From Swiss-Prot:
The keyword Disulfide bond applies. Its main location: secreted. This is Attractin. InterPro entries: Attractin, Attractin_sf. One of its GO terms (molecular function) is mating pheromone activity. Disulfide bonds join C4-C41, C13-C33, C20-C26. Water-borne pheromone that attract the marine mollusk Aplysia into breeding aggregations and coordinate male and female reproductive behavior within the aggregation. One of its GO terms (biological process) is sexual reproduction. It is found in: Secreted. GO terms for cellular component: extracellular region. Produced by the albumen gland of the egg cordons.
Length: 56
Protein backbone atom coordinates (compact mmCIF):
# COMPACT_ATOMS: atom_id res chain seq x y z
CA UNK A 1 0.00 0.00 0.00
CA UNK A 2 1.52 3.30 -1.02
CA UNK A 3 0.12 5.08 2.05
CA UNK A 4 3.31 3.78 3.60
CA UNK A 5 5.36 5.89 1.24
CA UNK A 6 6.32 9.21 2.85
CA UNK A 7 6.33 10.99 -0.51
CA UNK A 8 2.81 9.76 -1.19
CA UNK A 9 1.64 10.79 2.27
CA UNK A 10 3.23 14.22 1.87
CA UNK A 11 1.65 14.97 -1.49
CA UNK A 12 -1.70 13.50 -0.40
CA UNK A 13 -1.77 15.74 2.67
CA UNK A 14 -0.50 18.82 0.87
CA UNK A 15 -3.23 18.32 -1.72
CA UNK A 16 -5.81 17.94 1.03
CA UNK A 17 -4.78 21.27 2.55
CA UNK A 18 -3.76 23.13 -0.61
CA UNK A 19 -6.26 25.93 0.11
CA UNK A 20 -4.91 26.36 3.61
CA UNK A 21 -1.86 28.40 2.62
CA UNK A 22 1.41 28.88 4.47
CA UNK A 23 0.11 29.52 7.99
CA UNK A 24 1.80 27.54 10.75
CA UNK A 25 -1.50 25.87 11.61
CA UNK A 26 -1.60 24.53 8.05
CA UNK A 27 1.86 23.04 8.38
CA UNK A 28 0.74 21.39 11.62
CA UNK A 29 -2.35 19.97 9.92
CA UNK A 30 -0.23 18.56 7.11
CA UNK A 31 2.23 16.98 9.55
CA UNK A 32 -0.64 15.47 11.53
CA UNK A 33 -2.15 14.12 8.34
CA UNK A 34 1.15 12.51 7.30
CA UNK A 35 1.55 10.94 10.73
CA UNK A 36 -1.93 9.46 10.70
CA UNK A 37 -1.52 8.07 7.18
CA UNK A 38 1.69 6.38 8.24
CA UNK A 39 0.13 5.02 11.41
CA UNK A 40 -2.75 3.55 9.41
CA UNK A 41 -0.20 2.00 7.15
CA UNK A 42 1.81 0.52 10.01
CA UNK A 43 -1.31 -0.97 11.56
CA UNK A 44 -2.38 -2.46 8.25
CA UNK A 45 0.99 -4.08 7.64
CA UNK A 46 1.20 -5.48 11.19
CA UNK A 47 -2.32 -6.91 10.83
CA UNK A 48 -1.31 -8.62 7.62
CA UNK A 49 1.82 -10.13 9.10
CA UNK A 50 -0.01 -11.41 12.18
CA UNK A 51 -2.53 -13.27 10.02
CA UNK A 52 -0.06 -14.67 7.49
CA UNK A 53 2.49 -15.86 10.05
CA UNK A 54 -0.07 -17.75 12.12
CA UNK A 55 1.08 -21.39 12.41
CA UNK A 56 -1.13 -24.14 11.03
Amino acid sequence: NNKCDIEFATSECEMRYQDCGEASSCTALIEECKTSLQEECNQASSDESSTTVRPE
